[in-house]
Amino acid sequence: KMIVVMSSGYAFREGEQPVFYPGDFESELIHNIIPYIENNFRVRKGRDYRAMAGLSLGSAQTTDIVAKNMKLFSAAGVFSGVAIHEMERICDSKETLDVVFMSCGCYEDQIRTGMKQIEQKFENAGKYCISKVYEGYHEWHVWRKSLYDFVPLLFRKKGVEADDIPREKTARITRQRLRMETMEEQILMFDPVYRQIRFETDEAGRPAGKYPDIP
């Protein structure tokens, strides 16, 4: 069994300029979210029972936070985003993660190149990581499969091969439909950009994003 915590990655402080990058989420996670979960739910404590994963911008947060706090996490899932410097820090750390999982869509060329670079570094260091590429772009077709493959690894022994991951049988979609549902509507995925959302804080300094057409 596991508890999945999906918190807001935007952690602006009172008086902080509300920009797109999500403030001090690391502090929010370590000093507020983790203690709250441990104090209010029946969970096992310690890094062996804690993992972190994220997609797109969330993958950057994951690699940054895990790299700085290797004693707090035993696994990292990086979906569609490779922060080279942070991944190198994870590889070079004296602490070793039980699971390092990277993934992206087959059309995300820049991310695929970064993943290959990190794979090679882990291999040269004698450390283990899993890298998966799925049909798709920077979108949910890829991230759903990434999560589906990542989660079982948290309950398996070290050294499991990527090909050993059981795959869910899904109907293969045509390339035309894939493009229609992803690339052609890519801008819709970035709803804040598409709708011109304004990232602001309320009087208490809490995130208060507003759409221009919503009072």
Labelled PLM ranges:
Residues P207-G209:
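Exposed regions on extracellular, virion, or secretory-pathway luminal proteins
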Residues K1-F199, G205:
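Non-catalytic cap/lid and distal C-terminal segments of serine-dependent acyl enzymes
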Residues Y211-I214:
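Short, intrinsically disordered, charge-balanced linker/junction segments flanking boundaries
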